[in-house]
Amino acid sequence: MSSADGALVLFSGGQDSTTCVAWALKRYAKVETIGFDYGQRHAVELEVRPDVLRSLRDINPEWNKKLGEDHMIDLSLISKISNTAMTQDVEITMMENGLPNTFVPGRNLLFMTVAATVAYRRGLDVLVGGMCETDFSGYPDCRDDTMKALQVALNLGMATRLKLETPLMWIDKAETWKMAQDLGGKPLVDLIRAGTHTCYLGERGALHDWGYGCGTCPACELRARGYANFAAQEK
């Protein structure tokens, strides 16, 4: 267990953030979660959040004791100041800068800043996020350098010693599935597979081996490929 007492986990209801909640529950005495409603097209992720949290409590009695308050924050202003495939009903395409139009400029910067403010009020020393720059779509606000710079800025701006943890930063999606198995065994893998949501289009009609989704958006492709590689390694 970490020497830090408490952590606040950015929890969307997806695979990565659910894995991060379990990771934090293994390390910290007190864990709270925070989610953001920013007018996302795949708002179904917000709908599954309460069920995922309840299931995490059921998987491990110790997790139930540690898991505290869930904070839901309205950041609908993001959809008002951005024009992306994450907040608008438009086709997912690549932009001239090489990024998919699912990139929401400043989103993770704003998420972390708001989360740091909540952590300050709640007396929590650690922020945990599922950012990753191995299996990812190239978003610049998911990079390790961005998170390190943001940690410095937040601590300077609030005179704190807040730590930003990104346990998935240097692992691929197959390793993320393996981390979930190591943390919570088959029950956690099954919960992530059937209970969480990642698909950018909000598709929850068909349950695939890797979970629900359209199977063609960047998020589904990463999740499906990661699960296939994970399953192959487990045989």
UniProtKB/Swiss-Prot annotation:
Zn(2+) binds at residues 199, 214, 217, 220. Binds 1 zinc ion per subunit. It holds the Pfam family QueC. GO terms for biological process: queuosine biosynthetic process. Pathway: Purine metabolism; 7-cyano-7-deazaguanine biosynthesis. Keywords: ATP-binding, Ligase, Metal-binding, Nucleotide-binding, Queuosine biosynthesis, Zinc. ATP binds at residues 11-21. Its cofactor is Zn(2+). Disulfide bonds: none annotated. Its EC number is 6.3.4.20. One of its GO terms (molecular function) is ligase activity, forming carbon-nitrogen bonds. It catalyses: 7-carboxy-7-deazaguanine + NH4(+) + ATP = 7-cyano-7-deazaguanine + ADP + phosphate + H2O + H(+). InterPro entries: QueC, Rossmann-like_a/b/a_fold. Belongs to the QueC family. Catalyzes the ATP-dependent conversion of 7-carboxy-7-deazaguanine (CDG) to 7-cyano-7-deazaguanine (preQ(0)). HAMAP family: QueC. This is 7-cyano-7-deazaguanine synthase. It comes from Janthinobacterium sp. (strain Marseille).
